[in-house]
Amino acid sequence: DDMNGDIRIDSLQLLSPEKDFRLSNLKMTSETRDAMHKRLTIISPSFHASIEGNYSYRTLPLSLKQILGRYLPSQKKQKESKVQHTFTPENDFGFDLYLADAELFSSLFHVPLTLYAPATVKGYVNDRMGRLRMEAYLPRLRYKQKFYESAMLLCENPADRFRAHARFNE
């Protein structure tokens, strides 16, 4: 959790039965400014991503499961059936993703998405307040065979209810 430094990867190749994906380079930088402030940045030709704030790598998935579990019955049932965790996440961070193209995302998750302009995803997670917000803007995209001039997605829980909005312009 207290990593400092860089990892640089040159000529990354991901192989799948349907398609191969090549990434000319990838750089990850992690810095810990103090016990309450960290930053992880990942930069490649296809995307730039960052997470900044107070977080623990080992509790990031648990944070999302606990917040979403209050609103999604399937998450709550999974949580109840597992052994209780001995730690409580106290994450409070913001995240930012700039996606120049969706080729890697489409290959890894088998989503038929093509971007014709860069997409952005921004948001935050705050465990103490039990809050999360994620907003995505995708200008000019194709999903399957359908072209959209733009799309906007918003997921948040500002009060004690979960809201999700999606808008697609053809």
What are the functions of these language-model segments?
Residues D1-E170:
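Interface amphipathic segments
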